[in-house]
């Protein structure tokens, strides 16, 4: 990939198998493009969204998503092998030699801070607070069993317990995945890269969160909240739009790759016994199921903003991007999480009073629990009120513009 001496080139380096990791740098890239800054994407999976916005996308090796998310879903602390990390670093370096970027903008590429150091490149990363060492809330709340009547959650003792929780979970995770710190030591990195911070930036980290949703502690100056980055999908409404709404209300279901076998078949049967209307974005996971006019509408992909605007409630897997998208529309949420990140997100949803969590196993054993949760959340006014309050907080941010401002500034700083 040739480059003139006058041009400025960004390598956008997401984990291309996951839409959230792909869409966040895309939003920043669109803003950078307006400023005449060249952006080239890299990924194993070619993206229609990237190409629709006239960006070039070059191929690079990535971990197999089935294996990677399988390990994460099964709670394996060693989520990737040492050999895989080495293979990814080599792929990174070969990519840099091909593209000749001035700066690497990563999202979900956990070898990027190491490879950018080796190559002598500036590196900015997009990440959620939950994947940093500065998170104020434990990822796995191991002390939640302590009764609130014994230790109040507002007191100083509980704050010390949470700090201990954070220290222990990070130490255990970093020990299980020592390969990152071993590379850091061997290369003499100024910042020790660990399993906890491997998704953050070597030079700057963009936090795609708001502090009211995910607070931090002792945040350094090269970390900055920019607000959520949610892609506005340019997808035309289906022929049946708008949906016929029954008296039970309109529910939008979007589950990504759920990890729940036969999820939409269960939903299809469940909704027919209610007065609800469901619009579902299936990601192609429906087999031979079809829509039933006025009851359930199934589409592979939908304009989520369009549907959420009409909906009373959003049911999702607890993914960070979907939660923020729902809150941007002031809609309460029911989450059915299957991986630790999603469970972490849904604990915040419950803590903020904007929704409820249903356990994956609980849903599979007794699907009616979803109907009960829908009735409870839609029938309790405070959930919608809290969701609208969160909307007003999120509205203060323009993540794409803020992220682009920082990336552009980093191009001029060494």
What do the predicted segments below correspond to?
Residues 2-156, 266, 279-306, 310-330, ...:
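Glycosyltransferase specificity loop/lid
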Residues 3-4, 199-200, 244-245:
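Short, flexible hinge/linker loops that cap or flank conserved catalytic cores
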Residues 29, 209-313:
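Donor-nucleotide binding loops and adjacent catalytic segments primarily
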Residues 86-88, 106, 185-191, 231-236, ...:
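Short gly/ser/thr-rich secondary-structure transition/capping motifs
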Residues 124-215:
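Active-site-proximal region of nucleotide-activated glycan assembly enzymes
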């Amino acid at each position: 990939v040739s480059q003139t001496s006058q041009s400025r080139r960004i390598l956008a380096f997401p984990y291309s198998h996951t839409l959230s990791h792909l869409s966040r740098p895309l939003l920043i890239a669109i803003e950078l493009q307006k400023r005449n800054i060249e952006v080239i994407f890299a990924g194993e999976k070619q993206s229609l969204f990237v190409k629709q916005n006239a960006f070039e996308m070059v191929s690079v090796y990535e971990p197999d998503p089935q294996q990677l998310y399988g390990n994460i879903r099964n709670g394996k602390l060693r989520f990737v092998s040492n050999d895989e990390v080495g293979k990814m670093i080599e792929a990174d370096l070969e990519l840099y030699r091909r593209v000749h970027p001035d700066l690497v903008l990563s999202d979900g590429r956990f070898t990027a801070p190491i490879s950018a150091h080796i190559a002598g490149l500036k590196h900015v990363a997009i990440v959620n607070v939950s994947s940093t060492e500065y998170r104020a809330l434990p990822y796995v709340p191991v002390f939640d069993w302590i009764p609130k009547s014994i230790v109040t959650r507002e007191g100083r003792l509980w704050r010390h317990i949470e700090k201990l929780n954070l220290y222990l979970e990070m130490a255990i995770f970093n020990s299980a995945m020592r390969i990152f710190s071993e590379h850091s030591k061997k290369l003499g990195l100024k910042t020790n890269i660990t399993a906890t911070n491997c998704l953050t930036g070597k030079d700057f980290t963009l936090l795609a969160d708001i502090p009211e949703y995910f607070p931090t502690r002792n945040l350094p100056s090269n970390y900055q909240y920019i607000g959520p980055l949610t892609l506005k999908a340019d997808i035309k409404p289906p022929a049946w739009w708008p949906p016929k709404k029954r008296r039970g209300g309109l529910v939008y279901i979007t589950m990504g790759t759920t990890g729940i076998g036969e999820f939409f078949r269960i939903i299809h049967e469940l909704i027919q016994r209610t007065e609800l209307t469901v619009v579902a974005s299936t990601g192609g996971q429906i087999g031979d199921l079809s829509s039933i006019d006025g009851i359930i509408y199934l589409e592979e992909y939908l304009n989520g903003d369009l549907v959420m605007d009409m909906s009373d409630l959003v049911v999702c897997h607890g993914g960070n991007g979907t939660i923020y998208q729902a809150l941007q529309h002031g809609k309460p949420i029911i989450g059915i999480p299957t991986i630790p990140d999603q469970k972490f997100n849904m604990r915040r949803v419950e803590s903020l009073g904007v929704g409820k969590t249903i356990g994956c196993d609980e849903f599979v054993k007794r699907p009616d629990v979803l109907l009960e949760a829908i009735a409870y959340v839609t029938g309790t006014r405070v959930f919608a009120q809290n969701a609208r309050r969160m909307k007003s907080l999120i509205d203060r941010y323009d993540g794409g513009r803020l992220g682009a401002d920082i990336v552009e500034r980093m191009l001029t700083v060494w």
